[in-house]
């Protein structure tokens, strides 16, 4: 991808990067491992963004 990006695209990519994380450990501990994965996780090669 080009190094010079429009600001809107850069913000969308940053938001997608921040949302692509595991749930916090305190959530896993509080739910007694009932919640261990996030349904919004995305792999960079398998699923592409519409950004």
From Swiss-Prot:
Coiled coil: none annotated. Residues 32-51 are annotated as: Disordered. It comes from the Archaea. PROSITE patterns: RIBOSOMAL_L39E (PS00051). Transmembrane segments: none annotated. Keywords: Ribonucleoprotein, Ribosomal protein. GO terms for molecular function: structural constituent of ribosome. InterPro entries: Ribosomal_eL39, Ribosomal_eL39_CS, Ribosomal_eL39_dom_sf. One of its GO terms (cellular component) is ribonucleoprotein complex. One of its GO terms (biological process) is translation. Belongs to the eukaryotic ribosomal protein eL39 family. This is Large ribosomal subunit protein eL39. It comes from Pyrobaculum calidifontis (strain DSM 21063 / JCM 11548 / VA1). The gene is rpl39e.
